[in-house]
């Protein structure tokens, strides 16, 4: 046996034949292996202990301690811990479907019913960990595997830790895209609340197909996370969007707990079968490791007998190792692997423990005299076959060993889809699922049967098919009681002489396809639905009217925001209708560029302009009130343009009315004086100095300057004239203390407020408000450790306020010779 093992490249570690690597990390390598006695595939994580420092050694021992105490159906189960020289081996459950991340890369976002199933299983596992006082701290799609029947399995407890009560953690760990804001800021944090944030990011990825805070650097990620803005796509339901926002809350105290997650209404939108399965799952989860040991006190005698025959272990050794949960003993691992195999076989409906032979009503089932023999513990043939055969992952000995050393493209650690583009949402396609229900992608190939073999089978009888579908008038319908007398049409007396091919004896001819693991990827990995539909017979052409399409669309997507009936394809793009429609509808004469939106463009098309001018000329030609009002308006506007009527220093001009904020942005219109807010002006200017010039916001005003255009309420003095700013090289606190001392000397009362600016970066800011209408704001400049001081005058004409600002600025210049003006 040594020569074949060397030829196949298998390495022996304990009772395992170790094969190819399926994953690699900084200090560890994961390989696929096969247990000799249980004949089950497992995953072995090998770590070189000599290459680890003291901190990583502590984390490794903590991981070993955690995997020994956890046992949950949606957490990868560990079987054995082996220490050989400088190597540490962790034997765990093997999941053949790969990572959830690779599934999302291949198929894109999933439907909410699929996301609900996966997220519920993840939430149940996290709830179990938190009940044990364990925090994962590295929840992400790469650390979630898909097992049998697409069940979730959480892996990688390298960053996990124990947490009790209100204890806070300080270690920064995890992946930045999934990290909570308190971790990004380097503060002490609650590990359980950090897991909830990671779960919120995970759910967003499942339903949206992307990250909630996309960025290409850690600094940009911090700014995006600390802004608190989560943009959820329109196709996400209202309940799911609310659920995501409740988990992605910046304040950990207001963030959801795992109990709130399990009780959210989105988690309970499912049918009765799924509700019963979820309830049974939560009830079956043990709340502590003590209950796990109590459930395992009774051992399976069949497994013990099998282990005594194949492992040469005594009954006492098996009982001590299993009840003591000795992970460093091969006895415990062997028993657990065999017990899992028996459990899977029972759940899959393998039948009774002793299958019946014959019939209870047979005449041969009477009593018989049998000589009594001494009772000896034996293993039935069914149980022996169940334990001795390979697991569902291993077909046979040869196939298992060859799979361990498989170097085909499908066995590599790379993704199956090299384009890495999001495909059709998983769970939404109906026809595609019928063709993608196998793990391997199917490609075109030659037929299984040759033309000579196909010629040996008689052609199907068209007369028989016609008779089965539409019986002739000469044959009356057969009664229900006599239908079983003629199971095949060939047995009918009327068709006894007609040759009929027995299709049940023919070999099943598969489709023209083959596995992509052969190395010839002739077709893309994702099934092209359009090619399949092109081969189907064309249905009769019938084009629905616009009203019918509108009703159908609103019935499906009427609950979404910004949904408007009968929007033209020119606005939203999409697929144009290749065949024109000739139905008479109320919408056929509508202008093509017309749309119903508050963000409509102020410009008009040529068709609309001509139509409006035509209506205007027709209205002026008739001698009615419209003509008289038009002449009066022209006279008033002409008189106002020539005469200057002053009122408190402001010119009374014809106001320019802006319909939308987008129109203000295009014409660069400044806000009026009545809505002047010195606090907002100071925050904007302070952020421009601290973080540079910012682009124009969605409100519509430019970020640095204002236009000369004004409204009737705006004064002759601009906003920039009422705002003065300087930059001091003194520390932030000294500037605040100096300003407060100066105001106290002048006996001017003031009120102080402390604020934090979170966008685009967390910045500290203090504001001093004076009764005379002066607002003094001081902000921190993080890179240079300087202070940005800004004075804003609310009163338009107040010499006292200007004099006070000049005195305070002179005071700051005296104590700081290196000041600079803005």
From Swiss-Prot:
- A Pfam family of the record is Pkinase
What does the tissue specificity note say?
Primarily neuronal, with additional expression in body wall muscle and hypodermal cells. Among neuronal cells, expressed in multiple sensory neurons and interneurons in the lateral, anterior, and lumbar ganglia, as well as in motor neurons in the ventral motor cord. Present in the AWB and AWC olfactory neurons.
Which residue intervals make up region (Disordered)? Answer: 348-367, 389-423, 577-602
Q: Where is the Protein kinase domain?
A: 16-267
Do you know which Gene3D superfamilies this protein is assigned to?
Answer: Transferase(Phosphotransferase) domain 1 (1.10.510.10)
Q: Which cofactor does it need?
A: Mg(2+)
Primary location? cytoplasm
Tell me the GO molecular function terms.
ATP binding; histone deacetylase inhibitor activity; metal ion binding; protein kinase activity; protein serine kinase activity; protein serine/threonine kinase activity
- Its EC number is 2.7.11.1
Concerning InterPro entries, the annotation shows:
Kinase-like_dom_sf (IPR011009), Prot_kinase_dom (IPR000719), Protein_kinase_ATP_BS (IPR017441), Ser/Thr_kinase_AS (IPR008271)
Tell me where it resides. Answer: Cytoplasm; Nucleus
Residues reported in the UniProt entry to bind ATP? 22-30, 45
Describe how it is modified after translation.
Autophosphorylated. Elevated cAMP levels appears to act via PKA to directly or indirectly phosphorylate multiple sites on kin-29 and inhibit function.
Per the record's keyword annotation, is Magnesium included, yes or no?
yes
Stretches with biased composition (Acidic residues): 394-406
| Top-level EC class as recorded in UniProt | transferase
Is Cytoplasm among the key words of this record?
yes
Q: Which domain of life is it from?
A: Eukaryota
The GO annotation for biological process reads: dauer entry; dauer larval development; intracellular signal transduction; negative regulation of fatty acid biosynthetic process; positive regulation of gene expression; positive regulation of growth rate; positive regulation of multicellular organism growth; regulation of multicellular organism growth
Q: Which GO terms describe its cellular component?
A: cytoplasm; nucleus
How does the record describe its quaternary structure? Interacts with tax-6.
Q: What does this protein do?
A: Regulates chemoreceptor expression by phosphorylating the hda-4 class II histone deacetylase (HDAC) and inhibiting the gene repression functions of hda-4 and the mef-2 transcription factor, enabling the correct sensing and transduction of food signals. Role in determining body size, the dauer decision and serotonin-mediated egg laying. May modulate the Sma/Mab pathway and regulates development in the later larval stages.
Under what name is this protein listed?
Serine/threonine-protein kinase kin-29
Please report the organism this UniProt entry assigns to the protein: Caenorhabditis elegans
